[in-house]
Amino acid sequence: MISNKKYIVIKKDTKDSEHIKGRGNKTYKIWRQLLKRALGDDYKSKYPTYADCSVCEDWLKFSKFKEWFDKNYRYDLEEQGVRLELDKDLLSNGDKIYSPETCVFLPSCVNNFIAKNKNTNTSGYIGINFNKNTNKWIVRIAEFRKSKRKYCGLFENIEDAIEVYKKEYNIQKLKVCEYLKELKYNDSIVSKIESLEVYNADN
């Protein structure tokens, strides 16, 4: 992994980039942010989920990142008011690396759906908690494009709770896929969403 010291040098070398002005300013800011997440020791200390995050050698050069950005950023969606975020997880196999092969610009609502359904809890299963007051398992799910979690019921055993959560999760995934199709994302991205499974901390 590239050291924090080298990261500091990279920042100094790119401050006078000709791409900082105009449209390229967005590109430069996103590049700086990904370097911070992948290489910044202070950032990783504050956000432990980025502890194992890294960046490919090519993207240490702003020109290389900009070349990829210009080919892959969906300006057409931005003009429609769709907020886009750089995602490194959907196309990877858990490697947590920023690279041309693992990154894609997704609508923020899609990115949020993926993230919310990966946060774990005491049961080991996302969206399932044991309610001590009722001695039952309570199920909630993050609905697509909604801020609050949907209540799905109370269950005597965790197997039933998991089954209900999986059913609801698949319903939400279908909504995400339909949305991406409307935005004309390619089939490979849609297929990746379709292949997402319920997060289990033991897996």
Placement of each model-derived feature along the sequence:
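Extended, polar beta-sheet/loop recognition surfaces of beta-rich domains
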Residues: 110, 118, 172-203
